[in-house]
């Protein structure tokens, strides 16, 4: 059903969602996650979640994998296989717990000048295990030793400054719109207007 823009499921589908999850046990890249969800019965609370809302459905509920004919995936194009994988990962991720990040804000003062640094570290991956989107740039650059050092910081702790560098940089223009981002921007155009009277 390629024309639906629904992002939620109907309550009727939600009642039998375990069938879709069970079908993904045969999809090798995600079978472990599907099995974890089925074994822990993590699908049971879905009907009361934000992912189920009959009022928001127009023609069809959100696209979800049926789990049927997984063996036939090799017959479709590579792009089609990737689309299926994205949809299946997104679908299974709604049954996983949220990702938990540790946010650290450092303020250091030396000779009357204040310097700020912000860090965001992934503490528990949650649904990011399924989507595979947990690798943030800042996180990837931190070593285990640095993560341990940052985690052990306490408020008011004095820190010695061993070295510093000056980095020149320029701001970059916003990314160009593509067909997907343009539609979202048009749907939410009022959010960009700061003047309440114009909004």
Enumerate the predicted regions with their spans.
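Core catalytic DNA strand-manipulation module of type IA topoisomerases
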Residues: 1-199
């Amino acid at each position: 059903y390629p024309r639906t823009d629904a992002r939620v499921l109907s309550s009727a589908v939600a009642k039998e969602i375990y069938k879709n999850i069970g079908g993904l046990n045969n999809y090798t890249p995600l079978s472990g996650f599907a099995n974890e969800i089925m074994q822990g019965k993590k699908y049971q609370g879905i009907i009361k979640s934000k992912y189920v809302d009959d009022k928001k459905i127009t023609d069809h509920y959100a696209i979800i994998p049926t789990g049927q004919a997984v063996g036939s995936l090799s017959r479709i194009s590579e792009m089609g296989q990737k689309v299926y994988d994205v949809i299946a990962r997104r679908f299974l991720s709604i049954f996983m717990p949220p990702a938990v990040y540790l946010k650290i804000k450092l303020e250091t003062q030396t000779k009357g000048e204040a310097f700020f640094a912000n860090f965001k570290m992934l503490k528990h991956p949650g649904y990011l295990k399924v989507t595979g989107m947990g690798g943030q740039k800042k996180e990837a650059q931190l070593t285990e030793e640095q993560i341990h050092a940052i985690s052990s910081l306490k408020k008011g702790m004095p820190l010695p400054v061993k070295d510093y560098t000056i980095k020149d940089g320029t701001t970059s223009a916003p990314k160009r719109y593509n067909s997907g981002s343009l539609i979202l921007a048009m749907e939410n155009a009022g959010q960009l207007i700061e003047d309440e009277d114009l909004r």
